[in-house]
Amino acid sequence: MPLNEPSSNAFPRTVLFDLDGTLLDSAPDMLATANAMLAARGRAPITLAQLRPVISIGTFRILAVAFPELDAAAIQGLIPEFLQRYEALIGSVSKPFDGVEMMLDALECAGTVWGIVTNKPEFLARLILPLLGWTSRCAVLIGGDTLAERKPHPLPLLTAAERIGVMPTDCVYVGDDVSDIQAARAAGMPSMVALWGYRSHEDNPMTWQADTLVEQPHLLSRPDVWPST
């Protein structure tokens, strides 16, 4: 899919990223967690192909794929077990997408400040940062339970910008799900769709009204790809 026409020849002052499906390929750890729960119940495992399209949506949808026969209340009741098992496995298989480290290095060399705004529980996201060597590099981390609202509400993005000390219009938000783009638009923040992320076949990012679509992380090492801020 072609990129939208870029409108800037400079890196943004600040970049905020989604985590799962944007910076981190966390699908293997989440698959291992779901399959451990299934094995504990004598059930057959699910596949990565089944799980990938729903990872950006959240734990509830992951469990709905693993346990399709359960109603919403029963699935909700499994979430604490999933989070406990996932905490034990976190970072064991997951790694940044190819090109992410190159991109982050390029941003930092240009003086760009970057942070993470994710719907993953904050304590889990914070466990990941030291495993990747990102603790001192990430200027702000907002999780799905950090505030009273989560994406697609704009509050997490607005709070991240405030904590860094910049205006929302000085930031670009990069994510792989429609809720990421909705949050950015509501916050008045330029946005980019990470096309390498966890989209389902039914998703059409061309309809999300992002400023830019980008195919691979390494392309974000180029200043001309970024939308203007």
UniProtKB/Swiss-Prot annotation:
Keyword Heme part of the UniProt annotation: no
Any one Pfam family match given in the protein's UniProt record, by short name: HAD_2
Chain residues that bind Mg(2+): D18, D20, D176
Gene Ontology MF terms: metal ion binding; phosphoglycolate phosphatase activity
Active site residues according to the UniProt entry: D18 (nucleophile)
Coiled coil: none
Gene Ontology BP terms: carbohydrate metabolic process; DNA repair; glycolate biosynthetic process
Cofactor: Mg(2+)
Keywords: Carbohydrate metabolism, Hydrolase, Magnesium, Metal-binding
GO CC terms of this entry: cytosol
Catalyzed chemical reaction(s): 2-phosphoglycolate + H2O = glycolate + phosphate
HAMAP family recorded: GPH_hydrolase_bact
Family assignment from sequence similarity: Belongs to the HAD-like hydrolase superfamily. CbbY/CbbZ/Gph/YieH family.
Protein name stated in the entry: Phosphoglycolate phosphatase
Organism name: Xylella fastidiosa (strain 9a5c)
Taxonomy of the source species: Bacteria, Pseudomonadati, Pseudomonadota, Gammaproteobacteria, Lysobacterales
